[in-house]
Amino acid sequence: MQCPNQNHMLVNRAMVVAALDSFEDARRIISGVLDLSRLTNTSVKGQHTNDTNYFSRYSNFFSQMPAIILNQLKCCIKAQVDDAVKMVLQKAKKVEVSKPVEKMLTFTTLNTYLGYPESTGCVMEYTEEQSGPIAAKLLITLLSSTLNAMVRPKSDPNISQNKIPRHYYQLKVHVGAQKKVNLTAIEVIRGCQHECSVVYCEFVRYSAYFAGLYDDQVAAILLYAVAAHNVQGFGARFCVLWALMCVRIAGFADDINIYIKHRGMSGLLPQLVEMKCLLGRGVNEIDVETEARRRLDVGSLSMQRLDENELRAAVRLIYSEELRRPVTYPLICDFWSSRWLWAANGSHSRALEHAHPELATRKEGQAYRKAVMEQWQHNPMDRWDGTVYVTPSAKLEHGKTRLLLACDTLSYMWFEYALRPVERIWENSNVILDPGSMGNCGIATRINGWRNGMPGQSFFAVDYDDFNSQHTLMSQKIVFEELFHHIGYNASWVKTLVDSFDSMELWIKGKCAGIMAGTLMSGHRATSFINSVLNRAYIICAGGHVPTSMHVGDDILMSCTLGHADNLIANLNRKGVRLNASKQVFSKTSGEFLRVAHREHTSHGYLARVISSAVSGNWVSDHTLNQQEALMNAIVCCRGILNRSLPGEKNPVVRVISRSVSKRTKIEEKTIRLLLSGRACLKGGVVYGEQTNYIQVYRINCRVERSEEKLPPYRHATEDYLNNHLADIEVMAVRQYGSDIADIMAQASWKKSMSTEGAEDVSRLSLQRDKTLPCLHCITEKETSLLPVRYGLFSSYPILMMLKDRIPIKEALKLAVTIGYRPQPNSDLELDLWGESNNSCAIEGVLPYNEATSLAQKLPCGGVVIQVIHNVYV
């Protein structure tokens, strides 16, 4: 038999067209029954209309589809239809009802759950029936029965005969698809074949419909099916067909996503939303240059029309709520000389160098800011004239591509200087600049506080349309003018910084294309700050000021009445603020914030999002994960998949992907399975499971093989830091244990840049079985969250922390004594000095991995079981 021909498969247009026809038929039925066009029309009109003709619509669509679909829907509502029949019989005093009456009652009951509320306003409030468990069950039944009936099995001979090469499915053109993916289709297929036969059989049965899909999409579809097929009775066939349909017809995935979220059912059906993510990165490409040039013409931009005085008053109110302590700025020379410590390692734009040749840096590979600052010997900040150099590129997100407008390193430095002291003392009352510090548990606690303290109100999530593009330059200037006015700061550089919004030059292909006429640059240092402040400011200007609201970037969740929400949306529309009308979610039971649906007793992340991340990896930089990074990434991603689908041993995801992770990390597959499943953990990590009696801990041994190629000779940032910012205790530590500290610091700065040139150090990973901790104590997650974060005495000495592994604990104690430390009897020196307890604990319940490990670090000892009261399936 001939080898399978990849090209033959990919050009088999008849196969692809047939697949689309089957899924389009299914889409037409589902969209008709659910009246999905009503929601998309709402996006255009901005106002809801009543649906009084559901009976004829149901009659029309159900007459065109196989009878089994309606019969299965009837099974879901049999009790409700029987009750309706009894009421009719009692009123009419008859023994049985006629077929037309029974049909009418069935359709009326269906509409009670799947229909829409009577509303003519901007915001729709669904009944408990329309957003409850029965409605969710009906939706699953409609989707599954329609797909089973309309999509006939059709297999690819190459798949059914188990003769497929490694790259049977085409890779995307982007370099990330070639080098950065974590899982390939063949790895997931083989994993299913050996460890999840029920999904593998369905894949073979419908394999012809996978023709023409990209490798990462096939991997994502199958991994989704592996994770979800045991959830809520979905079944493997439904999961495969549902994921296939959402990838084949991305517009339908959007429609169902809106339908579920609009009803506040995303917490009931988190496995069905955001399915468009399975398309992966590098899809729906945009014309970057055209999109960027559009921002040069104010006439082509659609920005808000808020009154300037109203906006200023709103911004002032925000600062009065969030900035209640004085802001102090360091000397600019000290800020500059400490750049090794604070510089983020984002991409460096060459546009700055075209305009200022004196700031030119080495041209090899992609430049990153930490490496650039090692090359700049003299401080360029005092010569800044306020010009911002903007370069456009495509930001490849899951399921879509956005325009990224990156700003230069010099402007980044100035806005870092301006904002860092402000962000440190920000209250995070309503405008939240650091949601990570709260975590999903903290957000859930705050939302439940609203739920209990504001009876009669509901959760309202406002959805802006392309929020960055709605900000005028004046509104961005107001954010900073009012900021400096509030903190009473009027240094000479303040005006330059504020005026810089009028001097943003767009650079394309090494040439200046013009001055930006409006919109917020998505790669500006202040993007998140500006968005978050203006987010709440626009709401205040529209009469939406409530104490119970949270704003992060373009995300909003508040607690209010229906009348308040309706008035708010109407006012925002009048003031020119663009909204996605069909995505305004008003719900009594569920509030979505930062892509997590929070219900009263549980919070839910969306499965498709973590599946796509687990498959595709990060395409932002060329840096390839080393073995240790790959292991940690696999543990976090796998825990996310387990939490969002089926936590526990019954989920075959761990077994399906363990061989691939073992191959990448060079760790024995048996050990990998223990770590991915949460039955064992790395030192300082957590295990998961009910009735855990002990914790098995593994210690990482990582041997680094230094690259033969030497680092570039530039290390000005390193030298400036060592010459100006070492404390006496750090000087002593460097003399004894850090003669090569400059090399270590420079390596940290250059690591990301050198990885793009193939000159990165190689890490060889091995794991050693460490101690087994008995579980002797128990504490709730809420009690743990109230414990203070334990900072070590040395935590404020970054160079000392870099040398931690070299300094024996007895010598560390001697250093600590020089700055006043006095050990107490039974002191935990590791914890007191370094602040790192490396405590491993057990999680009884469901928590995201990173939040669980953060809680573990608050505990005074290991071997503790943390009981989760509010499960967070993220």
UniProtKB/Swiss-Prot annotation:
It comes from Leishmania RNA virus 1 - 1 (isolate Leishmania guyanensis) (LRV-1-1). It catalyses: RNA(n) + a ribonucleoside 5'-triphosphate = RNA(n+1) + diphosphate. Belongs to the totiviridae RNA-directed RNA polymerase family. Its EC number is 2.7.7.48. InterPro entries: DNA/RNA_pol_sf, RNA-dir_pol_luteovirus. The gene is ORF3. It comes from the Viruses. This is Probable RNA-directed RNA polymerase. RNA-dependent RNA polymerase which replicates the viral genome. Catalyzes the transcription of fully conservative plus-strand genomic RNAs that are extruded from the virion into the cytoplasm where they function as mRNAs for translation of viral proteins and also as substrates for encapsidation to form new virions. Once encapsidated, the positive strand is converted to dsRNA by the RNA-directed RNA polymerase. Displays ssRNA-binding activity. It is an enzyme of class 2 (transferase). GO terms for biological process: DNA-templated transcription. Pfam families: RdRP_4. Keywords: Hydrolase, Nucleotide-binding, Nucleotidyltransferase, RNA-binding, RNA-directed RNA polymerase, Transferase, Viral RNA replication. One of its GO terms (molecular function) is hydrolase activity. SUPFAM superfamilies: DNA/RNA polymerases.
